[in-house]
UniProtKB/Swiss-Prot annotation:
Residues 1-11 have a biased composition (Acidic residues). Residues 101-110 have a biased composition (Basic and acidic residues). Its main location: nucleus. This is Protein cereblon. Pathway: Protein modification; protein ubiquitination. InterPro entries: CULT, Lon_prtase_N, Yippee/Mis18/Cereblon. The keyword Nucleotide-binding does not apply. The lineage of its organism: Eukaryota, Metazoa, Ecdysozoa, Arthropoda, Hexapoda.
């Protein structure tokens, strides 16, 4: 898809600067504080005596409260924080907000003293979110097999032979589409074997005991097609986790990243996948084993098993994963996902992709070689309510409970835009009100979802690209509208985080620092 982010970082590719740069650029043309920005300047008739205080005597908590209020108000307006800083007399408006809040506190204090016997009002409860049921929408249900085929590459893809025996998923189980110069692979792709290559994760911090390790996955190409621009479309599937010793790499990886027409080679170590079956399933109860699969006798049978083993019940429960799988199944029923694998190894990686863990938890599940431990880590997150936050300003964008599968591969899928940039996309029914704005015009060109047009969406608070809105252009197609959040622009966080929904402590801190410098 054609948006601000491309594989080659160019100036015109991302016209929206990060929030720190936007703040500095917007404030740079401001002149030094003039008399109308001074706290000693005459105020209106309603101004309190606080306005006559020197600027350095304004309490920091009052200043922060005023800035937080202005930031919250800016989020619901067009232009977000950038528009707030572009207005004239910014510091004067900050000072006026301080005085306005002080007068409001004074009036509230007087009202409270007069009505001291009355009980304080309870804070308003959040408005419950109305659940969305896509089955209630009229029209033809979208075929989730279409996005998995990546048909936006065209219809002239040829199957690469020799990879059918690797159709099973090892890690992460995702199809990785990409578009590069065909000369990189064609010379080394035998006629009967699909090319296997490695994809490294340089941003994944290795363990402290060996900082020279690079983790990644092996991938195998299984389809390719011509683009007509001396580029070749490839589809590959991730297979296994690997670790590379950076000292063994033949060719500097940093140079390869900047020059994609070059290659590097290295020996890799395939990381093992250890799985221990549940201990009680290994206990032979003789003739009583026939009661194992009878629901009414299952609990009693389990108690007999525990009494006949030297292991405590907690030790047996540590390796039990069926309960975790059942809890995950119930949670994913909301997302209309019914393609859960049966193999525990495949299942552990599949759950990581579809349950949307935090970045820290993703790293832990990737680095562990024990499937049982991986499933236990996943099970510890099932009760948590998670949100999508803007990676640039920490503003809340959407609830993870609104995720749903528009592809047979799940709620999170890799897609490639016309410039070759690969986007990790999370599909959700809706985003929070006043959370997004739009950029450019909608288009159906190179659409990842046939029958839908895409429209670039921005975080309304910091004006950074966070994904796309997809709207049906074919009649009777359901869902009518949904959103795709770009994995590079959002992060997963707990709903219990202290980050305010209508503001950002990160932006507030930066504004306070700039205001402090201007007012000294």
């Amino acid at each position: 898809m054609d948006d601000e982010e491309t594989a080659e970082v160019e100036v015109e590719a991302n016209p929206l600067d990060p929030i720190d740069d936007a703040i500095q650029d917007d404030l740079s043309p401001l002149d030094p504080p003039s008399s109308d920005m001074s706290l000693e300047s005459p105020g209106s008739e309603d101004d309190s005596d606080l306005e006559a205080l020197p600027r350095w005597m304004i309490p920091q908590n009052r200043l922060r409260s005023a800035v937080d209020m202005m930031v919250s108000q800016a989020r619901t307006q067009n232009g977000g924080i950038a528009a707030l800083l572009n207005r004239d007399n910014f510091l004067q408006r900050v000072r006026s907000m301080v005085f306005s809040q002080e007068r409001r506190r004074s009036r509230t204090s007087d009202d409270t003293s007069q009505d001291g016997g009355e009980q304080a009002e309870e804070p308003p409860q959040p408005i419950p979110r109305t659940p969305i049921d896509i089955d209630m929408e009229e029209g033809v249900r979208f075929d989730t097999n279409l996005p998995a085929e990546h048909s936006y590459f065209g219809n002239h893809l040829s199957r690469v032979p020799g990879v059918d025996y690797l159709e099973h998923i090892l890690f992460p189980g995702e199809v990785l589409p990409f578009m590069i110069d065909g000369s990189l692979f064609d010379d080394e792709m035998p006629g009967l074997d699909g090319l296997i290559f490695g994809v490294g994760f340089p941003l994944m911090q290795p363990p402290e005991d060996n900082p020279h390790k690079l983790y990644g996955v092996t991938c195998q190409v299984y389809e390719k097609g011509e683009s007509g621009r001396q580029l070749v479309f490839y589809k590959s599937r991730a297979l296994q986790r690997i670790v590379i010793n950076c000292d063994d790499i033949q060719g500097p990886p940093q140079y390869i990243a900047r020059n994609p027409t070059s290659k590097c080679f290295s020996k890799v170590k395939i990381l093992p996948e250890y799985f221990l079956p549940e201990p009680l399933k290994c206990v032979d109860m003789g003739s009583m084993s026939r009661f194992r699969d009878i629901p009414s006798m299952r609990d009693k049978y389990r108690r007999y098993q525990l009494s006949s083993t030297p292991w405590p019940a907690d030790a047996c429960q540590e390796y039990a994963y069926e309960e975790i799988v059942e809890r995950a199944r119930k949670k994913l029923e909301i997302h209309k996902i019914d393609t859960m694998p049966r193999c525990p190894i495949q299942l552990s990686f599949w759950l990581v992709r579809n349950l949307h863990l935090t970045e820290k938890m993703m790293r832990l599940t990737f680095l562990t070689d024990s499937v049982n431990t991986r499933l236990q880590l996943i099970g510890s997150t099932l009760k948590e309510e998670s949100l999508f936050y803007c990676r640039y300003c920490n503003s809340s964008l959407a609830y993870c409970s609104d995720l749903f599968a528009m592809s047979k591969h799940g709620v999170q899928t890799q897609y490639c835009n016309p410039e070759g940039y690969i986007h990790e996309t999370n599909t959700v029914y809706r985003v929070m009100s006043h959370a997004i704005g739009y950029s450019g015009e909608p288009s159906t060109k190179f659409s990842w979802f046939p029958g839908y047009q895409w429209h670039i969406i921005l975080c309304k608070f910091c004006a950074q690209h966070v994904g796309w809105e997809f709207k049906a252009v074919e009649p009777n197609l359901a869902p009518k509208v949904f959103f795709g959040l770009a994995g590079s622009s959002v992060r997963i966080g707990k709903a219990s985080e202290s980050t305010p929904v209508n503001g950002s402590s990160f932006v507030v801190r930066n504004m306070l620092r700039l205001i402090s410098n201007e007012m000294e």
